[in-house]
Amino acid sequence: MSIRILPENEIKPSASAFEIPPLLFANPKNLYTRRAKRLRELAKNNPLRDYLEFAAHLVDIQLTLLETAPIGNYAEKLTAYLTENQGQKPLNKQQFARDEKWLELLLALIKQCKPYATGAILTTLEFLEKASYAELNNLADHLLNERYEQVSPDQSVFIWLALSLYWTQLAQQLPRHTQAEIGERHTCPVCGSAPITSVIHLDKTQGLRYLHCALCESEWNMTRAQCSNCDESGDLNYWSFDTVEAPIKAESCGDCHSYLKVLYQEKDPYVEPLADDLASLMLDIEMEQKGFVRSGLNPFLFSIE
């Protein structure tokens, strides 16, 4: 799946196509506020409490940087690029020519995190702070091209959070009269990243499934009861530690032997992709013991995956 800008004469005639919105863009301020709050709520009585609270603090920093150091206006540049490259993923993580703004975000994130860091985390931050722009861009290239093993897990978290803050703001500036093209739906139609989880929505999109991007935070629609990794539907199963009413389940596929978590807003309206995925790590361990491979990506799990 990719997206294209609709010509003016197609916007009104195509209104019926948006009864099921194929693509939802994030509201970064609301997203980071909600995510940090959810992480702190889930930290209570969770064996990963310290890590969840650490993650919440980093999300707080993302929100602060969003408000105090925005990337600026890229809208005209993005519109021109989209017009010339119809049907392509506009912010393709492997091809989009990022500028130094993401590096400024990374260094600002490090600066705000250092006063609270100790031990190995402080060592990691100091290494990244002293690295050259060329070295940092090389590490980012590895992550964006899915060569995760080439980057230290401790470094990956901070680099990805800066990249995500950059990409999310870029996605926010894409023209809103865009339409998703039918095609491959396994990765984000905006940037090509893997999803964190899928979410079954409430409200205007009630009952619809959307996959939540791990990089630009956009969401794209995908049919339920269909594997988000291989499109097969004949051997899907749903797993949880609780009851059939659990708000978090793992959807496994017997055809490709992958799994992706599904969050149900009707069971818990406060579920949040990154936070709930991270807090339910024990479900990942259980799924891997059953022989399934995780198809989703969570930046806070680089050190575990």
From Swiss-Prot:
Identify this protein by name.
Answer: Protein FdhE homolog
Provide GO CC annotations from the record: cytosol
The molecular function GO annotations come to:
ferric iron binding
Entry's localization field: Cytoplasm
GO process annotations (BP): protein maturation
Coiled coil (UniProt feature): none
UniProt-listed NCBIfam families: FdhE (TIGR01562), PRK03564.1 (NF002925)
**What does the record give as the function of this protein?**
Necessary for formate dehydrogenase activity.
Domain of life (superkingdom)? Bacteria
Name the species this protein comes from: Haemophilus ducreyi (strain 35000HP / ATCC 700724)
Q: Which UniProt keywords apply?
A: Cytoplasm
Gene3D superfamilies (UniProt xref): FdhE-like domain
PANTHER family reported for this sequence: PROTEIN FDHE
Q: Which family does it belong to?
A: Belongs to the FdhE family.
